[in-house]
């Protein structure tokens, strides 16, 4: 299982204080992947704007290291966390977009997933052709289960969500997303609906995600909550509030509604719903 830093972003696993200079120093410790892993996560979590942050994360993104017995980190863990961190940094990370685009073709499934999500967060329009190409074979190939593992051949949910986040409305984009509306996995269907709601604004896609809030699997309900929150689709307010899931996740989804771009002043009903969960 991958080492996951705790919720406290100011302390390392050993309990010593960590700040931006220390995180930058640790990211350069090529012989200590656990320190690099934590440092990359910390810099992303804190949305570091230091001039060296993107430079060092781009270097870390190129690091490849298989998981070894006794390690506390997953395969290519430093590169994966570097990819995730870059997506959180905003415009300062623009120079890393070519690196993330290249990473979309990496053999590492988890690394492709992290790169796709970050390209979506960075609104990298240059990524659209590659994202479409990765999904073009549809559920029968890209969306098929990879032999010997529970994962799909492509990280379809991440690729679909990136297309929605980037927001390029073209026929080829809409067509490839439509391919996954009836995927056997509800989480993938939710990602496709999320993307189409973002791209078209059509309420039918929001309604399909709301229906998934009643799914018997908690994992599916969680995914639909996060997808609805990401779209900021206001009609889902009551359904989100009443979903059988953790209040913490419902609060995240409701915050997405409160922060939607076309509603600069948070709606009182959303704030009341959030207060009721606290």
Give, region by region, the residue ranges found by the protein language model.
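N-terminal "cap/leader" segments of large eukaryotic alpha-helical scaffolds
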Residues: 1-41
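Amphipathic alpha-helical scaffolding segments comprising HEAT/armadillo-like alpha-solenoid repeats
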Residues: 14-27, 48-69, 91-105, 124-146, ...
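Short inter-helical turns and helix N-cap capping residues of alpha-solenoid HEAT/ARM repeat scaffolds
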Residues: 31-32, 64-65, 74-75, 107-108, ...
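Non-membrane alpha-helical segments in proteins
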Residues: 34-45, 59, 76-85, 114-117
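Residue-level detector of extended alpha-helical repeat arrays and alpha-solenoid scaffolds
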Residues: 36, 75, 79, 112, ...
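Conserved hydrophobic register position within alpha-solenoid helical repeats
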Residues: 39, 82, 115, 156-159, ...
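Long, ordered, amphipathic alpha-helical scaffolds
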Residues: 183-186, 190-197, 216-278
């Amino acid at each position: 299982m991958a080492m996951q830093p705790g919720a406290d972003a100011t302390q390392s696993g050993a309990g010593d204080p960590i700040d931006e200079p220390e995180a930058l120093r640790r990211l350069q410790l090529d012989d200590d992947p656990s320190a690099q892993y934590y440092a990359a996560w910390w810099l992303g979590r804190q949305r570091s704007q230091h001039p060296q942050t993107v430079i060092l994360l781009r270097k870390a993104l190129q690091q490849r290291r298989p998981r070894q017995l006794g390690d506390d980190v997953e395969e290519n863990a430093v590169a994966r966390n570097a990819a995730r961190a870059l997506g959180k940094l905003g415009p300062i990370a623009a120079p890393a977009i070519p690196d993330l685009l290249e990473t979309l073709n990496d053999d590492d499934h988890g690394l492709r997933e992290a790169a796709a999500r970050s390209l979506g967060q960075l609104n990298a329009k240059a990524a659209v052709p590659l994202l479409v190409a990765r999904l073009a074979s549809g559920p029968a190939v890209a969306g098929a289960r990879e032999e010997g593992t529970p994962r799909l051949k492509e990280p379809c949910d991440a690729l679909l969500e990136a297309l929605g986040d980037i927001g390029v409305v073209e026929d080829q984009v809409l067509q490839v997303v439509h391919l996954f509306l009836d995927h056997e996995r509800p989480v993938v269907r939710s990602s496709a609906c999320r993307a189409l709601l973002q791209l078209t604004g059509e309420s039918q896609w929001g309604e399909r995600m709301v229906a998934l809030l009643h799914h018997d699997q908690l994992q599916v309900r969680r995914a639909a909550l996060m997808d609805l929150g990401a779209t900021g689709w206001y009609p889902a307010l009551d359904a989100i509030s009443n979903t059988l899931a953790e209040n913490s996740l419902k609060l995240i989804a409701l915050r997405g509604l409160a922060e939607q771009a076309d509603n600069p002043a948070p709606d009182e009903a959303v704030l009341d719903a959030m207060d009721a969960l606290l």
